[in-house]
């Protein structure tokens, strides 16, 4: 099983962060891509590549609106060259990167077209762009392996897009095993419904809020800011909730209608405070090592091969965040190696 550290791009400490992830035996480092809230992601990823030798790297996640597909393809292909083959392109419909410039997440059809266009560019192909033959011509002079695309998905439409267009799909559904199993079933159903032959099914991952801590109630507070971000995807208007635990429906309603965009990612935001301990416990992986290992094993058993570990943020919780990352590396990762 792959374990990726989920971080925020900060030019001041990105090289230290990346080297620490590699030393702690994480497989990868994924950085948020939200231009109004943090440093430029691809510059930070390039610095991370220079500071490491085996750590996989990529945005977690970019979006189809703030960059033209050719720009995104060129940026990630350049990272692939700099890192000597360690790049993965994580992409979703857009959240804070879009609402901070007055836009909503892009529609599923626009998202699919963007992914299909990216695949053409990243495979070295060409396409007609307003009558012009458009291609990343410089790729011909490299030995780059093709960069895999990893679609971040919550609802059935985007899960279906990922299943049919991309090498990887990572669910943003929380850690409830039944919800994740529903996501896996949607992959299978999308392939079946398409009546198309695909060369291979995408590998499956999950973005999970995780904190290894002997005090489970403190762990819940440490992940509260991140749970607020990822749980509000399910609370958004139009989000599919047929598969959601009935006890959680009202919480998702509040996260959708009362989400405070100005306090995005803050545990003291009104929407974050609406979440009960029980909700956070279901949505995340928290508690002592044996509790976390049991839940991750159950998630692995349904076909999840990769986890992006969204731990407590260092800029919010300081040393406690560092300790949580180190405990995950010491107490959890070795269990799933070999």
What are the language-model segments listed below?
Residues 1-12, 62-69, 143-154, 210-213, ...:
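Active-site mouth loops of central-metabolism enzymes
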Residues 28-51, 63, 95-98, 174-177, ...:
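Glycine-rich, proline-tolerant flexible connector loops at the mouths of alpha/beta enzymes
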Residues 25, 48, 79, 118, ...:
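Conserved, mostly hydrophobic/aromatic
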Residues 104-138, 180-301:
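An alpha-helical appendage that flanks or caps ligand/catalytic pockets
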Residues 1-6, 29-31, 56-60, 87-91, ...:
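Hydrophobic faces of well-ordered beta-strands that scaffold small-molecule active sites
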Residues 10-21, 75, 153-161, 289-298:
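Short, acidic/polar
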Residues 1-59, 147:
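N-terminal beta1-alpha1-beta2 module of alpha/beta enzyme domains
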Residues 42-62, 66, 121, 325-338:
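Alpha-helix-loop-beta-strand connector modules within alpha/beta enzyme cores
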């Amino acid at each position: 099983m792959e374990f990726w550290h989920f971080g925020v791009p900060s030019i001041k400490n990105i090289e230290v962060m990346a080297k620490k992830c590699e030393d702690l035996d994480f497989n990868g480092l994924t950085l948020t891509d939200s231009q109004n809230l943090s440093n430029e992601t691809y510059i930070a990823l390039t610095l991370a590549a220079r500071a490491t030798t085996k750590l996989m790297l990529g945005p977690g996640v970019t979006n189809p609106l703030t960059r033209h597909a050719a720009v995104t393809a060129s940026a990630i292909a350049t990272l692939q060259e700099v890192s000597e083959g360690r790049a993965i392109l994580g992409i979703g419909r857009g959240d804070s990167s879009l609402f901070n410039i007055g836009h909503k997440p892009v529609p599923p059809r626009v998202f699919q077209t963007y992914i299909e266009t990216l695949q053409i560019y990243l495979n070295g192909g060409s396409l007609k762009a307003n009558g012009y033959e458009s291609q990343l011509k410089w790729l011909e002079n490299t030995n780059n392996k093709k960069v895999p695309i990893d679609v971040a998905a919550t609802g059935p439409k985007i899960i279906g897009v990922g299943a049919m267009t991309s090498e990887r799909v990572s669910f943003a559904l929380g850690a409830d095993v039944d919800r994740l199993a529903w996501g896996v079933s949607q992959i299978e159903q999308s392939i079946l419904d398409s009546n198309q032959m695909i060369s291979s099914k995408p590998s499956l991952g999950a973005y999970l809020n995780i904190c290894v801590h002997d005090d489970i109630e403190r762990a819940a507070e440490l992940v509260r800011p991140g749970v607020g971000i990822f749980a509000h995807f399910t609370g958004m208007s139009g989000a599919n909730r047929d598969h959601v635990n009935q006890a959680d429906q009202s919480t998702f309603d509040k996260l959708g209608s009362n989400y405070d965009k100005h306090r995005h990612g803050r545990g003291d935001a009104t929407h974050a405070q609406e979440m009960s301990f029980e909700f956070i416990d279901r949505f995340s992986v928290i508690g002592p090592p044996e509790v976390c290992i049991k839940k991750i094993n159950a998630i692995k058993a349904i076909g999840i091969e990769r986890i992006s570990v969204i731990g407590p943020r260092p800029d919010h919780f300081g040393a406690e965040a560092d300790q949580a990352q180190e405990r995950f590396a010491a107490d959890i990762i070795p269990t799933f190696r070999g």
